[in-house]
Amino acid sequence: MAIFELFSFDIDKLLVWVSKFSPGKILSAICRLGLDSWNNFRKWFWGLNFDKHEWAVDHFMPLMPRFSSDMDEVAKRIVTPKSKPKLEDCLEIDTAVEECFNEECFEPQEDGSMKLKRVAAPQQIKRVRTGMIEDAISAVEARIRNRHMIMGDDMGLVDEAAVRATAMDICGEYKINEHHTRCIIYAAAYRAMTPDQESIDATKMAYNPKSQARRDLVSILRKNISFGGFKSLEDFLSAPVSFPVEDAPYQILGIPEIKVADKRASRVCKFKRVVGLPSLSAGQSVCVHKTSLHNMIVSLEQRVFRVKNETGEFVVPPQPSKGAFDSISYFREAWKKKLYSKGPVVKSSIDDVVACYSSEKKKLYQKGAATLSHRPLHWRDSKVRAFIKVEKLECDKKAPVPRTIQPRSKRYNLCIGRYLRLNEKRMLDAIDAVFGEKTVLSGLDNKAQGRAIAKKWSKYESPIGIGLDASRFDQHCSKDALKFEHSFYRECFPDDKTSPDLLDWQLENEGSALMPTESLVKYRTRCRMSGDINTGLGNKILMCSMVHAYLKEVGVNASLANNGDDCVLFCEKGDFNRINDSLREWFLCRGFNMVVEEPVECLERVVFCRSQPVCVATKWAMVRQLGSLSRDCFSTQNWLNPTTFRDAMNALGQCNGIINDGVPVHMAQAKRMYAAGGNRKFDLKALHKQMEYSWRDRLGARTNLLWSEVEDSTRLSYFRAFGIEPAVQRIVEGYFSESKISEEGRQTNFLPTHYSRLHKDLLVPRYLN
């Protein structure tokens, strides 16, 4: 085989060799000649016209990856390449730049008051070390390649802008000075947009005729396979699929506070199956918990009676220190002053409370109101009747614990609702007045919330957003915390003789749950009941008052965005360490396990109520996180019924189309749902029927479907928020627009893990770090 000593290859020589030797022997002989010979052959082989020489693909393509891997190992043994410096190794402090940012803090005065003071803190701007600019550019280029899908001629201006934005974010992350930032952005970004040899080889491997032929063969085979009762995979993807609800995969702890007794009667279980629409889902796994004895006990154990400590053990929730809430009483007095500045607080009538509800819930409250006229309220009416909440939960990363709703009787709710239901908005406005700005953002549509959060962000020179994770807030609402909350209501009705009893009944809770298995679960507890009519209002009062007191105590000037237990603090970057060092311990003394999340320095990365700000056509709006693309494709309604399915698609398409007008990906999914619903005219009654609870808050006063064009600036903002680059956005939108939807659904015993054509890993937030 002396002919292999020639370092030049042509197709005729290869034909001669193949006629005499096997492909494996040929490649082995080339490898034995050394790395130069192998590299020359590999470069020549990948340059072949595979359409013209399919025989070369058949003989050598299956063997190329193995031999390439072997020769790479040989190269490593011959010479160990010098590791390239990391970006941080290429940088040093730029002493020529003396930029500072203003750090605000409160200082105690002799009279005991606190005075706001601004302190200049150095920015610590960096520059590239002498002679290391090429290494710095290479380091940034590598991070860009790992973050972006490098395209060919179809790469547009928006994609280029996204790559440059990534390079700029990297430079901003390391605080590189303006001059070197400009050099790195243009060099690294455009080098990364040029495919390297590895990218070219991988593309040839994936798209050569032989690989395409194999994919075609699989497509032919799929047409002859029955898929869970469907004719083909395409049939499965395009139709609604019904599968059973499930038990949570958790063991029962055996807590003595929970008792199970036999009962002759049993509760009728309404929700036994879930229906999903694979063709429009984003691929995340979604589960719904069934009403079962196992789920009820697990939920009570892990969401009411026990919490996990740092070692993963289940323990009793932390209790507040004695007198822990005394230092927050000033907030109640300030709140009361703001509340009464708008006039006295008036107790409502029973009929006014009933009028607050609609549909089936209104009928239930009308029945409860009728009984109050001849049978006075009794403490037994405050007993809790628990049930498993039917909700769509993402379960890719971790199996969620079932959620229990613990409401009291309609009679009790009507009586306490006379004090709180119609006064709730006014009480929340008083919280805003104490803070001096809009703080409680519930009740605002997504655009109003986006404007409010952007306004808070713009108040600071070097702003950061800090999420406060109040894990299982209701479970941590101790008896002392509830008493503190109730003191706000007592201040509003100091001479009333009924309200104290109604509030005291919330401190000692006796609950039960009737299960379909003819079992009765009984328990007693002293924490917040999630079904109480004042749960939302009470959580906002507690959280806002505690955060206000904490910020005042540590002397940090910060702005709060609140919606119950969802909290985000906005402040100067220099204040993060003080918050991070003290907040958890401060809240733990009051019985709450609060976690300070990592700060974000980009407005689009702020997470509030599972939504993030996106600049849509120059205006900020909150856009739901990517998991909503999957959750909206599942329902406990009977989507196997064509009429119900069309109504649901119409309602979802309308609502999401209005909320996400001009938003990448989200609007495309909504538009396809609306088309599946028949493109019917906007019907407020039909929408209200499908979305009884939150449609008004979501839509605000908007009722027109516009289907606005997605602007390039919006794609970039969406990219910063969710890490989905513009090219992928357009690919997914094209997929949604071409998806086929059938109304002829079927039942399956389970939903496959990868049930959607959009793989779950495609639409997940991807950030630089």
Curated annotation (Swiss-Prot):
Catalysed transformations (reactions): RNA(n) + a ribonucleoside 5'-triphosphate = RNA(n+1) + diphosphate
Enzyme class: transferase
Keyword Transit peptide listed: no
GO biological process, one term: viral RNA genome replication
Family affiliation: Belongs to the tombusviridae RNA polymerase family.
Role description: Probable polymerase.
Protein name per Swiss-Prot or TrEMBL: RNA-directed RNA polymerase
Organism of this sequence: Carnation ringspot virus (isolate Lommel) (CRSV)
Taxonomy of the source species: Viruses, Riboviria, Orthornavirae, Kitrinoviricota, Tolucaviricetes
